[in-house]
Amino acid sequence: PAGWMTWYAVKFDACEKAVLENAAWQKEHLADFGANTIWVDWEWYHSAFDIHGPEGIDYFHPDPVRYPHGLRYVADKIRELGLIPALWIGPTNEPASNQFIEENPDTVLAKQVAWCGEYFFDLTNEKFLNEYLPAAVKKVKEWGFEALKWDCLPVTLLFADQYHEYMAHPELTSEQALREAVKRARALLGEDFYMLSCAGAADREILFAIDLFDGARIGGDIFNWREFINDFVARVMRFYAYHNTETYCDPDNLVIRPEFNSLDQAVSRTSFLSVLGLPVTLGDNLPDLPPERVELLKRCLPALDAHPMDIRESHHESDRVIANLTISRSFEQWNVVDVLNLLEQDNRVTVDLEADLHLKKGRYLVYDFWNKEFLGVVEGSVTLELRPCASQVLAVRPYQGVPQIVSTSRHISQGGVDLKEVAYEAKTRLLKGVSAVVAGDPYEIRA
């Protein structure tokens, strides 16, 4: 799934109107590029952090002010647009007492106000497992949602650890108990229902049920540039080996609005996410985005089907990150390289084609995607002058000595999404090909 999410874009201003306005905007401007999902995050029954929840609003009773027509109405409207409705859930706790808790007080393991709730269930309690959890999970489908984001996993494990001796079955570890809950949810929803775990504050929250979830949030909320560098980039380097091998690693929303980013920073965030083929979740109020930032979204959609080359945790230099994507097609193989300046000052970076990109010694055509500039035929290395927090994304293609493509404009992969056939006919001296493009989107072939 790729598309808009409420929390990062509008936070506690999320409501039916905001969701449907962004869904309609996404349908008109981004759906043809690959944005196919709308995520309703936790505001549907939460109104603030660290407070006792309002009476009458809980998992089974969405906020009637924010969603006056109910969640089924919202999901249906999203689906009418041809988009996938997705829902945030936190079924291991409740923000306020409700009928189930009042009738089954022994199902509550801890009553303690946390960011997401106050009543935390005993994961091993039979009534929780056999009554509350199935009812909560079934509601997702009853309301018409086709994907979910299961949050509150770290704090659930925290309280399960702290109050472990009071569990109905303390012989189970906290991870085993939570895994059983996830396993039951998966059985109810089926194998084809997309489930995203959230969030990965530590390794165990990502790994305890990696085989049961389809995707995993691998870090905390990312808004400003420092959070992007210290959490987003760092967590990707640590967990990328799992991406598209065991799970889809989700490093958090792509937030590019001017409130949190210069244009260079917005380009850098978009580039790093896209070149690595990570999930694209949009974290801005879409109608408010300036046109040049909407353009960034068009060039990173759809998410690439990329797999890691490394089987272990990666590292990077303190002043830069180089993300190297190899694209292999029947007609050509080339590299797309994101060079990210981590410094808030100018930075000269030299990329060694053999040492950094693992390319054979030879001549290569190098094209700068964002600056729309051909950097020439390169041997050995290429040196870049990067502005503070800026990125350059390069297409690096083996020099063939005949007319050939150096880049295309549709996608940051510079042919990975759009090029379907390419061939040079020596007899006629013609370069021929077939591209899949988006209607109304200007398309350039750079050769």
Model region roles, listed by residue range:
Residues 77, 142-144, 189, 197, ...:
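Solvent-exposed loop and beta-edge segments used for protein-protein assembly and interaction
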Residues 33, 346, 359, 440-441:
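A cross-taxa feature marking solvent-exposed loop/turn segments within ectodomains of secreted
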Residues 37-258, 265:
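Aromatic- and carboxylate-enriched substrate-binding clefts and catalytic-loop regions
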Residues 11-15, 283-285, 374, 441-446:
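Short amphipathic alpha-helical segments with coiled-coil-like heptad repeat character
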Residues 1-107, 113, 120, 280-282, ...:
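Conserved structural scaffold segments of CAZyme catalytic domains across common CAZy folds
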Residues 171-400:
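Active-site-proximal substrate-binding groove within the catalytic cores of carbohydrate-active enzymes
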Residues 370, 375-377, 383-447:
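Non-catalytic C-terminal accessory domains or segments of carbohydrate-active enzymes
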Residues 29-32, 139-144, 360:
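Alpha-helix termination/capping residues and helix-transition junctions
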